[in-house]
């Protein structure tokens, strides 16, 4: 019996290398396929869109916060990989009675790399995970952006407006971009137009997910803060903490070039 610890310091015992894995977090699903688990992943969520050919082929077990528990039970997985923030606690607690559940808890690049290495070890892909972590770290080490002393409001939702606050993975990525989070609150607070005025961000990022902000929403924010730079950003680059981190540094370089240019 192999014993592991997840990122909540829970003990996970596995009698053998898992062969029937259900992943209920998009970025971690992509990671599993990147590490070569082509046949072991038997279930994913409807939001696990990468890689596309796997998204089309693998059974969907609901959404990240609305999992089909009965379907998951019927599939008889030997491991479920989840996340403290992206999944509902009540549902995960129910799944713990089905099979071992490994839960990640991501706040920054270090905890993301720890997750990648831990998951790699869990699924007998430790060497591949170590190589991936080294590649990601190397690319971030080459990301040298000036501290702009510009305040940014990173919007994740509309009606009500919600932003990414402190103590979030998104906040840690904003710091990598040399930006200061205009939100003083932790996690994902709601914000009003008046609150946005008081925060005085120099830059507003409108994320592509979870709310799909589009070009048409830029004017909406320009009416509130006409002098702020309002930019659409790829939410996956700021919030996916698996193998997609490989592409984040290059994206941040290009994004910040546009921020300083405008």
Where are these regions (language model features)?
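N-terminal ligand-binding lobe of clamshell/alpha-beta domains
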Residues: 1-262
């Amino acid at each position: 019996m192999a014993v592991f610890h997840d990122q909540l310091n829970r003990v996970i015992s596995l009698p053998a290398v898992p062969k029937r894995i259900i992943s209920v977090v998009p970025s971690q699903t992509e990671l599993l396929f990147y590490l070569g688990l082509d046949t072991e992943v038997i279930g994913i969520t409807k939001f696990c869109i990468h890689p596309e050919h796997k998204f089309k082929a693998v059974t969907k077990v609901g959404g990240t916060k609305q999992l089909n528990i009965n379907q998951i039970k019927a599939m008889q997985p030997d491991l479920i990989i989840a996340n403290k923030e992206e999944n509902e606690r009540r549902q995960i607690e129910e799944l713990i009675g089905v099979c071992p559940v490994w839960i990640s808890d991501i706040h920054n690049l270090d905890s993301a790399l720890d997750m990648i290495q831990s998951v790699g070890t869990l699924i007998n892909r430790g060497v591949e995970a170590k190589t991936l972590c080294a590649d990601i770290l190397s690319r971030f080490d080459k990301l040298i952006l000036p501290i702009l002393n510009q305040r940014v409001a990173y919007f994740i939702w509309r009606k009500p407006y919600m932003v990414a606050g402190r103590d979030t993975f998104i906040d840690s990525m904003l710091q990598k971009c040399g930006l200061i989070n205009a939100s003083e609150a932790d996690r994902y607070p709601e914000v009003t137009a008046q609150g946005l005025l008081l925060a005085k961000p120099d830059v507003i990022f409108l994320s592509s997910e979870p709310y799909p902000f589009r070009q048409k929403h830029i004017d909406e924010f320009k009416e509130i803060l006409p002098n702020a730079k309002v930019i659409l950003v790829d939410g996956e680059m700021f919030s996916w903490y698996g193998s997609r981190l490989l592409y984040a540094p290059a994206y941040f370089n290009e994004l910040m070039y546009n921020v300083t240019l405008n």
